[in-house]
Curated annotation (Swiss-Prot):
Subunit structure: Heterodimer of LeuC and LeuD.
Lipid biosynthesis recorded as keyword: no
Secreted is among the record's keywords: no
Listed InterPro entries: 3-IsopropMal_deHydase_ssu, Aconitase/3IPM_dehydase_swvl, AconitaseA/IPMdHydase_ssu_swvl, IPMI_Swivel, LeuD
Protein name: 3-isopropylmalate dehydratase small subunit
CDD domains: IPMI_Swivel (cd01577)
GO biological process: L-leucine biosynthetic process
Pathway the protein contributes to: Amino-acid biosynthesis; L-leucine biosynthesis; L-leucine from 3-methyl-2-oxobutanoate: step 2/4
EC number in record: 4.2.1.33
Gene this chain is encoded by: leuD
Length: 199
């Protein structure tokens, strides 16, 4: 994975509560095993009309949000069934950062595991950001090292992140690469394990 340290991009607002993983990536698109190519299916039922044309009433179809890489989402984002395809779809769509008052726990972890940064903010701080960026084409900067969000006017908001996940993102580690870093320790442990554990 690519390291994520500082990111600047357009922020799009999807102010809907309880957006579940089936709304993020509908089940009919889960048959593929590749991690790429899901972006065109993200929010499919909201994003397109029955005839396949873009839905002009869907928030993320607004021209102001073209090229957005930061998503300001509503409460309990990513709830519902556990499907890793949800962060795959969001990442392939172009989102690197998701900011919300709350996330479903499994979805929250899956974002980190797939190189995305989910940021929980207190409701009032989140609400202020959502109101600023709604229907606007404005950028913000997220600094993971300093754990700050800097809005388009230069105002900063601090956020918390688990040190383990922070290290993973800063270094571009996934679970496999992190395990490989511990290869020597794992081999030492296997050599020292009790004989009754050996076949």
């Amino acid at each position: 994975m690519e390291p994520l340290k500082t990111h600047n991009g357009i922020a799009a607002v999807l102010n809907r509560i309880n957006v579940d993983t089936d709304q993020i990536i509908p089940k009919q698109f889960l048959k593929r095993i590749e991690r790429t190519g899901y972006g065109r299916f993200a929010f499919f039922d909201w994003r397109y009309l029955d005839n396949g044309d873009p839905n002009p009433d869907f928030e993320l179809n607004r021209p102001e949000y073209k090229g957005a890489s930061i998503l300001i989402a509503g409460e309990n984002f990513g709830c519902g069934s556990s499907r890793e395809h949800a962060p795959w779809a969001l990442d392939d769509y172009g989102f690197k950062i998701i900011i919300a008052p709350s996330f479903a726990d499994i979805f929250h972890q899956n974002c980190f595991k797939n190189g995305m940064l989910p940021i929980r903010l207190p409701y009032e701080a989140w609400k202020e950001l959502a109101e600023q960026y709604e229907y606007q084409s404005l950028t913000m900067t997220v600094d993971l090292e300093k754990q700050t969000i800097t809005d388009h006017a230069g105002r900063q908001i601090a956020f918390e992140v688990d040190p383990h996940w922070k290290e993973m993102l800063l270094n571009g580690y996934d679970e496999i690469s992190l395990t490989l870093l511990l290869e020597e320790e794992i081999e030492q442990f296997e050599k020292q394990r009790s004989s009754w554990l050996q076949a």
